[in-house]
């Protein structure tokens, strides 16, 4: 079997299945894989159910998450699809962003309708900025009453609208993932209809390359006769020799400088692109003016802040987290991109304390400014070990 070449010709999109336990998320993931494999065998391998269900554990920022990654192609797009077997894995994945989602397929069993985790996943999807949701109304082969299915569909649309998604217009596709896996023709077609809806309704994400340049600085050193070099992995955008950039964060003032060279593996490049580890040579910048934790960015594209609201998952003791709860005025380190900055936590009114395993909102004040934007991820650490993971939900100042 020749190794398939990753074709860059199709736009790429990251999606995931969300929804209540036992409503058929993993069965649907397997069904999509099988149906697309049968329709486009040269484009798609098949991922069987048990392979997805026994998802490998991944460690993200010291948090163990079981997550299954599969890929498949429709005629229009290349997809990376994530499925988490356990509910706790979902919550952790959504908050830590272990697997980014450009859109989600909400699986709701027509036999049950929306359940508590259905609501929780939709709320999480909104909080973490998932732009669009397509609904897969599953197990429709088990419901004979058309009115009952219509009722469930109405409930799901209302739920989506209540969480600021477009409940009126989002596609709701009636499927049976189990029957599609068995090869039933009618239900196989329902899976193809679902993927057509995903192709059409989930917007094409802006590629990292097209976003404004940003590189978190990992290291700084001097090359005699040439100046100061900062190294790191380009998070987004492109940086070219001769361009003006800003150095943002940690210090009160943002510095402006010009890129005089870009290097990768000791080779001189014209530019550094998203995803690449590069060294960037800066004109007239002193080594002592730059520290790890700052970012190099396109002028005006990111700003330094000290106060923000965040949503945080607090690790349980058996995940290596704290053994005891914490209260307001707790002062751990907040790890943004490449560095720790001490911050003080204020819990929301009515929340006395936060226990290991909780999911909470908090307001944080950092002692140094950090280049940040909405949805930026961070870890909470104590003495170098991760005790929580979160993302910025609102910048205060």
UniProtKB/Swiss-Prot annotation:
Residue segments, region G4: 138-141
TM regions (residue ranges): none
CC terms in the record's Gene Ontology section: cytosol
InterPro entries found in the cross-reference section: EF-Tu_GTP-bd, EF-Tu_GTPase, EFTu-like_2, EFTU_2, G_TR_CS, P-loop_NTPase, Small_GTP-bd, T_Tr_GTP-bd_dom
Binding site for GTP: 19-26, 83-87, 138-141
Entries under SUPFAM superfamilies matching the protein: EF-Tu/eEF-1alpha/eIF2-gamma C-terminal domain, P-loop containing nucleoside triphosphate hydrolases, Translation proteins
Region annotation G5: where it falls in the sequence: 176-178
Record CDD domains: EF_Tu, EFTU_II, EFTU_III
Protein name: Elongation factor Tu
Species: Cutibacterium acnes (strain DSM 16379 / KPA171202)
């Amino acid at each position: 079997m020749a190794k398939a070449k990753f074709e860059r010709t199709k736009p790429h999109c990251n999606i995931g299945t969300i929804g209540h336990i036992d409503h058929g998320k993993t069965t649907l993931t397997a069904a999509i894989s099988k149906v697309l494999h049968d329709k486009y065998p040269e484009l798609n391998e098949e991922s069987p159910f048990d392979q997805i269900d026994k998802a490998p554990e991944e460690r993200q920022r010291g948090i163990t998450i079981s997550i299954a990654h599969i890929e498949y192609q429709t005629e229009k797009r290349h997809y990376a699809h994530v499925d988490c077997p356990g509910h706790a894995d979902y919550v952790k994945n959504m908050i830590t962003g272990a697997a980014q989602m450009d859109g989600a397929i909400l699986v709701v069993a027509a036999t049950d309708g929306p359940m508590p985790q259905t609501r929780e996943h939709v709320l999480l999807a909104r909080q973490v900025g998932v732009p669009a949701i397509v609904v897969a109304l599953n197990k429709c082969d088990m419901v004979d009453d058309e009115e009952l299915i219509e009722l469930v569909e109405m409930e799901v649309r209302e739920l989506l609208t209540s969480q600021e998604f477009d409940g009126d217009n989002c596609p709701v596709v009636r499927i049976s993932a189990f029957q599609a896996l068995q090869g039933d023709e009618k239900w196989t077609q329902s899976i193809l209809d679902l993927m057509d809806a995903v192709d059409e309704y989930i917007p094409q994400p802006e590629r990292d390359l097209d976003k404004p340049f940003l590189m978190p600085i990992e290291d700084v050193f001097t090359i005699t006769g040439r100046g100061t070099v900062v190294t790191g992995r380009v998070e987004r955008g492109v940086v070219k020799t001769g361009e003006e950039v800003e150095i943002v964060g940690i210090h009160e003032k943002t510095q402006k400088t010009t890129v005089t060279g870009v290097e990768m593996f000791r080779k001189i490049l014209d530019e550094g692109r998203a995803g690449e580890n590069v060294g960037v040579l800066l004109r007239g910048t002193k080594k002592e003016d730059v520290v790890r934790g700052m970012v190099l960015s396109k002028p005006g594209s990111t700003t330094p802040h000290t106060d923000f609201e965040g949503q945080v998952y607090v690790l349980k003791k058996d995940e290596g987290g704290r053994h005891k709860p914490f209260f307001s005025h707790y002062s751990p380190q907040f790890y943004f991109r490449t560095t720790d900055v001490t911050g003080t936590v204020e819990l929301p009114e009515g929340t006395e304390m936060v226990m290991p395993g909780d999911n909470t909102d908090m307001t944080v004040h950092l002692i140094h400014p950090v280049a940040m934007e909405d949805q930026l991820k961070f870890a909470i650490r104590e003495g170098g070990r991760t005790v929580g993971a979160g993302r910025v939900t609102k910048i205060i100042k």
